[in-house]
């Protein structure tokens, strides 16, 4: 009984999901012996392991969203986008062609979570503006501009439109149309 109580009483509040997600990318990028068992080390990242671990975190984020734990959901979604952007490698271009195993799927999942968070009644205005602020920083990561794995600008526009009053949203759309 104690184990079940202890497990159910533990919350996500004490966990730093941002650090835990970044650790995944850091720990599976270390040198290991190559598969040819020669004296050269293989410094490539084990992407399959990274993405298997990311699956777990994104499932946690879905669960936290269903519980109304917006902070944990936001932390996981934003760190997913940041870590993928900061750790993207050219070899992933070939992996991304596989529909079941690609960075864009993880980015889309994280972006979808953020859209659900923004539309959730428990989400505060401060959380919404914090999301936008961090997305602006993430959008500056060159990976998103150079490789087109995910359109962060589109996500920011959707979030902006959903949190603005109708008049402001129309002004924003007009401004975007003028710049294009």
Regions found by a protein language model. Give the residues of each.
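Eukaryote-biased, non-catalytic alpha-solenoid scaffold regions
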Residues: 2-180
């Amino acid at each position: 009984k104690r184990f079940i109580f202890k497990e159910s009483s533990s919350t996500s509040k004490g966990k730093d999901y941002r650090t835990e997600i970044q650790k995944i990318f850091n720990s599976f990028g270390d040198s290991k012996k190559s598969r040819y068992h020669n004296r050269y080390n293989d410094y490539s990242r084990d992407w399959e392991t990274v993405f298997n671990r990311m699956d777990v975190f994104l499932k946690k984020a879905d669960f936290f969203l269903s519980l109304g734990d917006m902070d944990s959901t936001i932390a996981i979604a934003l760190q997913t986008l940041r870590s993928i952007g900061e750790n993207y490698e050219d070899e992933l271009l070939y992996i991304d062609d596989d529909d079941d195993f690609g960075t864009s799927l993880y980015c889309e999942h994280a972006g979808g979570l953020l859209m659900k968070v923004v539309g959730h009644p428990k989400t505060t205005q401060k959380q919404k503006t914090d999301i936008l602020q961090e997305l602006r920083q993430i959008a500056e990561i060159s990976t998103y501009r150079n490789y087109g794995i995910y359109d962060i600008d589109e996500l920011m526009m959707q979030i902006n439109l959903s949190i603005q009053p109708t008049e402001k949203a129309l002004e924003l759309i007009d401004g975007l149309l003028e710049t294009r």
